[in-house]
Amino acid sequence: MFRRNIITSAILLMAPLAFSAQSLAESLTVEQRLELLEKALRETQSELKKYKDEEKKKYTPATVNRSVSTNDQGYAANPFPTSRAAKPDAVLVKNEEKNASETGSIYSSMTLKDFSKFVKDEIGFSYNGYYRSGWGTASHGSPKSWAIGSLGRFGNEYSGWFDLQLKQRVYNENGKRVDAIVMMDGNVGQQYSTGWFGDNAGGENFMQFSDMYVTTKGFLPFAPEADFWVGKHGAPKIEIQMLDWKTQRTDAAAGVGLENWKVGPGKIDIALVREDVDDYDRSLQNKQQINTNTIDLRYKDIPLWDKVTLMVSGRYVTANESASEKDNQDNNGYYDWKDTWMFGTSLTQKFDKGGFNEFSFLVANNSIASNFGRYAGASPFTTFNGRYYGYHTGGTAVRLTSQGEAYIGDHFIVANAIVYSFGNDIYSYETGAHSDFESIRAVVRPAYIWDQYNQTGVELGYFTQQNKDANSNKFNESGYKTTLFHTFKVNTSMLTSRPEIRFYATYIKALENELDGFTFEDNKDDQFAVGAQAEIWW
């Protein structure tokens, strides 16, 4: 189109000149004719250049150029243009139309980052996620993970877990907002090349919709700033990242809740959720569905002193059983449901040089206490892998945790996860009813910071647990792990920055295995493994 316009303009410009030349042809010499043609050609080229420059201006975006910066020595920093076009620092954005009485430019400068955020906010859609994936091999056969929840994750996990969240704003007017949120999570197998969900060796590939809910703001007169949600969603999870389990977790099939409700100096989170369970009989072959409901209440972000906040939490789970379900428990060998609760507190300290530490105290009874007694994964579930069973007699368990990271000087950082637990008269999934247990697990991860993008360090893990059954027989489980690693990072924080690519060499040894009888390949009690793993969230 642009070339066609140029050609048309040239013809129109040449036409009158050609007519004039024809009328004077008989009275002009050859030299005079050539001079006239050269003059006309120069004028035509000048006009064409003018039109071309105007067309370029129409399609060139306005940018705000930055002045050349100088370094400490006074020299211009990178004064020469590179072969690759540089992004402009800012764009000019047209503001709302001004009234005749207003003065000033109707354009304002906006950085590309701000402009990108503006477009994203205007669309109202976001896509967030997490996954990990990697390769590993071991000294004898396929590498195996063991006691991740006690020995730590580095060089000890071979899964491909993922979370993918889609969020769309559907309304945002008059101080009211509505968002639709869907989250999928699951695992992609890292052993076989094929990974069809639900149709693979070992059932390693699976996926579910863990969240599907609507969240709003501004609809509750008494809490306009709070997030009010309805749907498949639970209260926020709090994780001990180095051990890959949660100190606070309330799974939900569906529910209703309120988050970040400002009351006094802190904020309240409250959720009422449904989570039905499969109640098994003594043979663990037959099951019945029992409807249970959970109330989860937290008062958080209570300021104590500078950079220190407190949270107080409580959770209660009760069943809504039918007459036939109770009859099966009384007469057909199904395990009786027992209500279960957990309450506690946590304190979070942030450090001036970066980093933090979180301390928590939790106490629970019945089936939640049973999960306190697990050495591998110790999240506060009400079931064991989705199955409810066992003689729960009101026994209790206590858990003390510490996790965090701290910078030591300019080139060292240390992360930690330490857990001490004990319980009395609980149902243990390894040693049965009326069991007592005591355990300690500790993982420390110091590293040398080369720069923003590189760290080299070691993760050291150790745990020991002793269970005592109803007959006072003692069962011990213990082990240790040493992992040397180098990581490629985008920031120096170990626990709060991703993406991260890590290369590792791990030696892991089971000292005692009287609770689970675990062995590595070839019935070995130890394993040496090397590998690489990527972990990312966005």
Swiss-Prot record:
InterPro entries given in the database record: G_neg_Bact_CarbUptk_Porin, LamB-type_porin_N_dom, Porin_LamB, Porin_LamB_sf
Signal peptide from the UniProt entry: 1-25
Coiled-coil annotated residue ranges, if any: none
Lineage top rank: taxon: Bacteria
Subcellular location: Cell outer membrane
Pfam families in alphabetical order: LamB, Sugarporin_N
A GO molecular function held by the record: carbohydrate transmembrane transporter activity
Membrane topology: Multi-pass membrane protein
GO cellular component, one term: cell outer membrane
One GO BP annotation of this record: monoatomic ion transport
Keywords: Cell outer membrane, Ion transport, Membrane, Porin, Signal, Transmembrane, Transmembrane beta strand, Transport
UniProt function note: May be a sugar porin with a broad carbohydrate specificity.
Family per similarity comment: Belongs to the porin LamB (TC 1.B.3) family.
Protein name: Putative outer membrane porin BglH
Organism whose genome encodes this protein: Escherichia coli O1:K1 / APEC
